[in-house]
Amino acid sequence: LIGQIQDSNSFWLSQQITKLGGTMQRISILDDHQPSIVTALRHAIERGAKTVITTGGLGPTPDDLTVPSLAELMGVGTHIDDAVVQDHLRRRGITIDEHTDNLKRMATIPDGATAYPSPAGWAPLVRAVIDGCTFFAMPGPPREMEAVFARFLEDYFSAGEGAHRALTHRVYVDMWESEVAPMLQQVMAAVPGTYCKGYIALGNQRFLPIDVVTRGADEAQAQSELNRALDMLEQLVGEAGRDFQR
């Protein structure tokens, strides 16, 4: 929020979760301020979110506030997780006497939560269920976050209630955004669950890029719907006497 760090985690997570069948409803960027964090997490529960993912705030410095915020929301204390400590000792080749205060802080989780040692860093994935909402607190560095997601969360979203598959294909049309917009609306109406988006900022002087996203119960159905949407859009553009590139 002070312009020092660019958020790439939410962009990456949105891509992965959509592919695996999840539906993103909201992305928030919060200051390192515990009351603000607790309020945002509580509002997510009140809105009926089934899953909330946080990234960052699991390190050893005073501004790492995710664990104490979760503990406050849960109304519990915290403890040092032995499995995370043992993972630190094994991977670092150290004894318990050499386990530093900073490492202990990164091994600390709310009472009643579950920790999953990270395959790429020292802060674990922390899972907590609060009033029917599952919270996953992930480390902030992108390399660590992506490794934790691949190890622990891909299967969670793939097996989720109402899970589906989503596919995306980018095409290019020889039209202005205002010209092709009615055609995109026709495609989305004809192929339910389809989303079409033109990117005028990415276009050159002639061709406008358009992403077509479709969903299905499985990859085969998503591909079938994608083919339908692409074929229809190509036909509409062709009928207007314009070029269409897949």
Where are these regions (language model features)?
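N-terminal beta1-alpha1 ligand-phosphate binding loop
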Residues: 1-8
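Conserved short beta-strand edge segments in small beta-sheet-based binding/regulatory domains
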Residues: 233-246
